């Protein structure tokens, strides 16, 4: 995937996730690695762009194995998840 195609993919992914649930965003291993066949470098770039986007919109952003609290419950970004972002 070219750099331009990857940015277009990332913007589309962000928009679709926000439409699904604007308060809780989840990127899974399956959707990035299996379904869209992204390389590790492409996944890193998608996560970097997404992190910047969501942090600029006041989301809390967490990556694989990170622990966090959401709706008064302790949670963890599981190994089959790349990223979780949310705002309360």
Task: Locate each region found by the language model.
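Short glycine-rich, basic-tinged beta-strand/loop micro-motifs
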Residues: 19-40
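C-terminal edge-of-domain segments
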Residues: 66-88
């Amino acid at each position: 995937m070219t750099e331009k195609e990857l940015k277009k993919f990332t913007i589309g992914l962000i928009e679709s996730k926000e439409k699904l649930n604007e308060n809780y965003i989840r990127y899974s291993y399956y959707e990035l690695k299996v379904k869209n066949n992204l390389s590790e470098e492409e996944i890193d770039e998608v996560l970097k762009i997404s992190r910047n986007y969501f942090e600029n919109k006041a989301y809390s952003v967490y990556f694989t194995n990170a622990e966090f609290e959401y709706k008064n419950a302790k949670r963890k970004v599981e190994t089959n998840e790349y990223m979780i972002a949310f705002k309360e």
